[in-house]
């Protein structure tokens, strides 16, 4: 027994009539312009078909003829076809211009809709993104304040002559304060010393401190 379940939507209707009338309705590629009044022909040919109603046929035809594929096919020099694919006269210029305008309008609507959808998507993504907490900038650690009270200078005294010996650890006045040093050579009043950084120099014995 043949399945008489009705078609669910216009897409299924278009697929069904393309299967029944393949020389007229095309599912892929550029469509052929349809004969004027083809709805009546369809309704008559499918009057006993319980799968599709006249209302469904009308809605399916409207969707088919408003598709970009169909509007692209409505161009100068093209011929309309009937259900069996037979030519039914060349397109009139008025119909070609109408199809061209409809195509441009349809594309403009799609472009505007896509633009609006993209804008909405950006706004939604922005709304979902957690707002950055306005934390104050991190303050860099300040160097320890220099004590107002300067440390008392270490009290030193001049060396006795018997303390000026090679290898003895002493302090030497370098102008900016005393620096530790070691005596490495003695030549009368001139004493060669080695600072803690390894630098050697000759100073007067009177500049050495204990």
Swiss-Prot record:
Similarity-based family: Belongs to the ProQ family.
Domain of life: Bacteria
Keywords assigned by UniProt, alphabetized: Chaperone, Cytoplasm, RNA-binding
PANTHER family xrefs: RNA CHAPERONE PROQ
Skewed-composition ranges (Basic and acidic residues): 98-127
Name of the molecule in the record: RNA chaperone ProQ
Chief location bin: cytoplasm
Function: RNA chaperone with significant RNA binding, RNA strand exchange and RNA duplexing activities.
Gene Ontology CC terms, in alphabetical order: cytosol
Gene3D superfamilies per record: ProQ/FinO domain (1.10.1710.10)
Pfam families listed in its UniProt record: ProQ (PF04352), ProQ_C (PF17516)
Organism from which the protein derives: Aliivibrio salmonicida (strain LFI1238)
One GO BP: post-transcriptional regulation of gene expression
Subcellular locations according to the entry: Cytoplasm
Region (Disordered), start-end ranges: 98-155
InterPro entries registered for this protein in UniProt: ProQ, ProQ/FinO, ProQ/FinO_sf, ProQ_C
One Gene Ontology molecular-function label: RNA strand-exchange activity
